[in-house]
């Protein structure tokens, strides 16, 4: 990661880092959900470390801006964990604390 961010030529300005395995493990599931299965009334708690996949899908739907994606994890950029208050895209549950998503979704299903 250090080499990718500091030593390689970086013509596009993209940063490398984060939790690639979490994103890779959820990309197919998120794609199937958002492009085939979900209805407008359905809610999703995104695995916190997979927020880049969520933000990318939201960008494809027009709910996220390219500028926010380019500033991912930086001041004014898309958040590293989905946030209902800090993100411009359509976040159903803020899931910054790992494990909190499960409790929030269970509670919301009861209310």
Regions inferred by a protein language model and the residue ranges of each:
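Cofactor-binding active-site loop characterized by glycine-rich and histidine/acidic residues
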Residues: 2-14, 20-111
């Amino acid at each position: 990661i250090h080499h990718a961010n500091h030593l390689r030529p970086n013509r596009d300005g993209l940063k490398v880092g984060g939790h690639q395995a979490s994103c890779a493990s959820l990309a197919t599931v998120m794609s199937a959900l958002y492009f085939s299965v979900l209805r407008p009334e359905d809610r999703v708690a995104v695995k916190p470390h997979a927020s880049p996949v969520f933000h990318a899908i939201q960008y494809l739907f027009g709910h996220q801006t390219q500028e926010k994606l380019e500033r991912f994890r930086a001041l004014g950029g898309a958040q590293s964990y989905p946030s209902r208050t800090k993100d411009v895209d359509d976040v159903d549950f803020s899931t910054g604390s790992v494990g909190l998503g499960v409790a929030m979704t269970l509670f919301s299903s009861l209310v």
